[in-house]
Amino acid sequence: MNNSKSNLLDTEHGDKVAEQMNLASMDCLPDDLLVQILYFLPTKEAISTSLLSKRWRTLYSLVHNLDLDDYIFWHHEDGYNQYFSNDIQKSFEEFMERTLALLGGGHIKTFSLISDEIYRFDHVVDSIRPWLYYNLQKDSLWQFGFPYKVFTSTKLVKLSLGTRLACPRIPQDTSLPVLKVLLLEYIWFEDNQLSDVFLAACPALEDLTIHHMFRPFLISSKNLKKLSVTINFSYYVDRSTILTLDTPNVVDLYYSDFPRPIAPHCHLDSLAKVELDLHSLEDDSRQVQNDADVKNLISEIRNVKTLHLTYSAVELMLSSKKRDWKVLPLLLERSPNLKTLVLSGLNRYTFGRRHRFVGIQIPSSNKIKMLSIKQYQGSATELKHISHLLLKMECLELVKVYLATEMDDLKKMQLTEDVVKLPAASSKIVEKLKAFGAKAVLERVSFLD
């Protein structure tokens, strides 16, 4: 698209924004508030305000966040593409350069770029990098393709990459010395390049989130403090790769996976908070397989202070042919510092022969202070479990029950009374029950939708 068309497009947007905004009524507003208004406008409309007056041009130059998406050039209100592909992409690149030139880039904290034209990115990012990375304090790059030059920045603190993109080779000169937060949304790395090259080039990285359709072979980092791993590949594969978590300093772990017959290798010495969201695999006929092995993972979870097992994790532990339902007592035995226990789906949890109720084995030496029950339905089985837990937890101070579905106040009050009437080993819980009674919304036993 030539410059005349580009200028015409900008003018049209400026007129449109002027029509939509009552400028006279906004003149009395302070600059800080107007900058916030610009922040919530789509980038194309926000930058068009710079054509309205010198004040608006100055105001837009104060915006700290920049979101660029070529969708606004491909799709128009009339429902069809106005220009040919090359013209559209060229127009988008020119728009990017003009926007960054207007902003100056020195004060930008968050930059977001979305585009399908992967092969053009190196040229574009190279042309804007003097602005983009100068005095940049915080950055979030989200796009369907990304230039390799994004891997070299001395200012980048937060980076988000996605989605469904293959990354065959990470540049050997990759260097992100101050990167602290990294999100990888369906990024495929070959071999162990994720850990050997990418993570190795991020010495300050503390928070890593990975969403993946296949298992990465290795996640290794000595400086990570928080790790979230979600594996969405659910089909049964005996020869599946063995996941290795070599993250000895992680204190907060979220792990969602379809465990295989071969257990993952883990090095997790510092865990304090763990949430396990485990699911059963399916074979080629979509039949559930229940021979998952999570012993290595469980054996590495020691001395945690907060343990959360989701409903699906509870179900997997129940159904496993390897009798993995015993891992919960094992976890509790290995966690003398456990203070918070979160359980879901108690209505399906641990039965003995002929459906005889079997309570969860709780070590007598436990120091659990808070118990959270999620997806509570008010069944007799759940009440038995809660009663069993209350009798086994002498240090308990707080019980939270999260309802599976919304309920009216009358039903909620009935469920509250059912729990309040249960005996408890903790003197603090008993004292609170006596003081408040069953009809109160108890401070120590609370029901939440």
From Swiss-Prot:
LRR repeats lie at residues 133-163, 186-212, 214-231, 247-278, 286-311, 320-345. Pfam families: F-box, LRR_At5g56370. Keywords: Leucine-rich repeat, Repeat. SUPFAM superfamilies: F-box domain, RNI-like. SMART domains: FBD. Residues 23-77 form the F-box domain. The keyword Repeat applies. InterPro entries: F-box-like_dom_sf, F-box_AtFBL13-like, F-box_dom, FBD, FBL60-like, LRR_dom_sf, LRR_FXL15/At3g58940/PEG3-like. PROSITE patterns: FBOX. It comes from the Eukaryota. This is Putative F-box/LRR-repeat protein At3g44090. It comes from Arabidopsis thaliana.
